Amino acid sequence: SSVSAGIRSSSAVSEVVRLTNSARGQNGYAALVEDGALSEAAAVRAREIARSFSHTRPSGASFSSALSESGVTYLRAGENIASGQKSASEVVNAWMNSPGHRANILNSSYSRIGSASVNIDGTLYWVQLFAD
């Protein structure tokens, strides 16, 4: 389908995770483990933010409901979203230069990460989901 064709290569998404873990390491935090169910939820959210750029889903529910729908159990969760950046390094740099996004990346409560990116009409939309 055209939607799945828009999902970015796993290498771009893997690079987001690698750079995120590098930033955590430089600041004294443990690396996050990539979680398949979180990544599935991130892919759902990437398509949603292309329609409505918000932490609230198009249905009106919180972003965290996408985690539950993908079978993720958690006590604490966070979401970083972005649009327009052309590469993994560009988006992680943007997040690290934004206090709220940086706080998610450097949150010691989180142990798992899921990431996704989708290309809609030439614009890249990026999502990171975090869970404890």
List PLM regions with ranges.
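Short, surface-exposed glycine/acidic/tryptophan-bearing loops
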Residues: 40-89, 105
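A short alpha-helix/helix-coil micro-patch that ends at or immediately precedes a cysteine
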Residues: 3-51
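Surface-exposed patches in mature extracellular/periplasmic domains of secreted proteins
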Residues: 26-40, 53-63, 102-118
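Disulfide-stabilized extracellular recognition modules
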Residues: 82-132
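Hydrophobic side chains within well-formed alpha-helices
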Residues: 12, 16, 34, 38, ...
